[in-house]
Amino acid sequence: MLAKRIIPCLDVRDGQVVKGVQFRNHEIIGDIVPLAKRYAEEGADELVFYDITASSDGRVVDKSWVSRVAEVIDIPFCVAGGIKSLEDAAKILSFGADKISINSPALADPTLITRLADRFGVQCIVVGIDTWYDAETGKYHVNQYTGDESRTRVTQWETLDWVEEVQKRGAGEIVLNMMNQDGVCNGYDLKQLKKVREVCHVPLIASGGAGTMEHFLEAFRDADVDGALAASVFHKQIINIGELKAYLATQGVEIRIC
């Protein structure tokens, strides 16, 4: 059995790490490189960086910090933000990123997933899905351009359909960003994760809602996700990664202990 992964998420805007609640009202957390170094030293299995306004601003991720991160950490990291072409992806990977993630650009042009997978291999192509639960209809809908509140829009895709579509097109991993739970710290949406797990046959990463160590355990044990991504609990030092992994190990979760 492959070890489950603990993945800190660093949302980047204007060269700094920020964090919002339900993708809104972002506050500055700190500088990118020192935070990345700290998480690697604490025992993170991987890092994910989102340049959150790159797609809505119509630009590729600001690359100046990518190579600096690669110099100070020895764990894999993934970069997302406005990657719309093979050339964009090649530049990010050449600066030291191990994976690239696409979200809004994939919705705008689904063929991009296949072209990236064919060029670089499915193992380094991640598709991020920003999903919102509509309580009135009971449905999960995919959102686009979520880095900019004024441009965020609901797409025609229901979440489960898009999960199946991106796999057909070559996604090697899916990060499910559950917008209703984002930054609220009251737990992952296990009901949604279980539904997605049934149709997701590539590694699935849960994102949005972690507030306690038990929330991570529930995602691994009850929804069988491959990794759990979180931001607020790590940024605010509510949970220490090393202590979290020790706890998960005592609960029978296969996890890499540093």
From Swiss-Prot:
Q: What Pfam families does its record include?
A: His_biosynth
Describe the reaction catalysed, as an equation. Answer: 5-[(5-phospho-1-deoxy-D-ribulos-1-ylimino)methylamino]-1-(5-phospho-beta-D-ribosyl)imidazole-4-carboxamide + L-glutamine = D-erythro-1-(imidazol-4-yl)glycerol 3-phosphate + 5-amino-1-(5-phospho-beta-D-ribosyl)imidazole-4-carboxamide + L-glutamate + H(+)
Q: List, from the UniProt record, the residues annotated as the active site of this protein.
A: D11, D130
Which GO MF terms are attached to this record?
A: imidazoleglycerol-phosphate synthase activity; lyase activity
Q: Quaternary state and partners of this protein?
A: Heterodimer of HisH and HisF.
Q: PANTHER family attached here?
A: IMIDAZOLE GLYCEROL PHOSPHATE SYNTHASE HISHF, IMIDAZOLE GLYCEROL PHOSPHATE SYNTHASE SUBUNIT HISF/H IGP SYNTHASE SUBUNIT HISF/H
Q: Give the protein's recorded name.
A: Imidazole glycerol phosphate synthase subunit HisF
